[in-house]
Amino acid sequence: CVPKRKVSPSXRNMRXAHDXLT
């Protein structure tokens, strides 16, 4: 995943962000 705006929980973006990170 690509960090767009740090790690802001936003609907489906949350999964992405978390996938990425972990």
From Swiss-Prot:
GO terms for cellular component: large ribosomal subunit. One of its GO terms (biological process) is translation. Pfam families: Ribosomal_L32p. Keywords: Ribonucleoprotein, Ribosomal protein. Residues 1-22 are annotated as: Disordered. GO terms for molecular function: structural constituent of ribosome. Coiled coil: none annotated. Belongs to the bacterial ribosomal protein bL32 family. NCBIfam families: rpmF_bact (TIGR01031). This is Large ribosomal subunit protein bL32.
